[in-house]
């Protein structure tokens, strides 16, 4: 399932996939795969993404 919440939060912060990837130390392809729903990130990666985007795990990764 696509992670549109993560993409929306990234765009709202005016960050490209590459910029977010550089901030958290992963490849742009990893960010793309997470947003497309092709990759299930580790909890540590989820936390790093949340910190950079100013969101909680619930806001970005939990469905509800």
List where the protein language model places each region.
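A short, Lys/Arg-rich alpha-helix, primarily the initiator
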Residues: 1-12
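Residues in the recognition helix of alpha-helical DNA-binding motifs
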Residues: 9, 23, 34
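Alpha-helical residues within the helix-turn-helix
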Residues: 11, 22, 51
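Short alpha-helical DNA-recognition segment
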Residues: 15-30
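DNA major-groove recognition helix of helix-turn-helix/homeodomain DNA-binding modules
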Residues: 44-59
């Amino acid at each position: 399932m696509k992670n549109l919440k993560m993409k929306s939060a990234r765009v709202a912060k005016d960050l490209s996939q590459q910029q977010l990837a550089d901030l958290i130390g992963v490849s742009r392809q990893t960010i793309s795969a997470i947003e497309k729903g092709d990759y299930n990130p580790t909890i540590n990666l989820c936390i790093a993404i949340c910190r950079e985007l100013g969101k909680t795990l619930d806001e970005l990764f939990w469905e509800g």
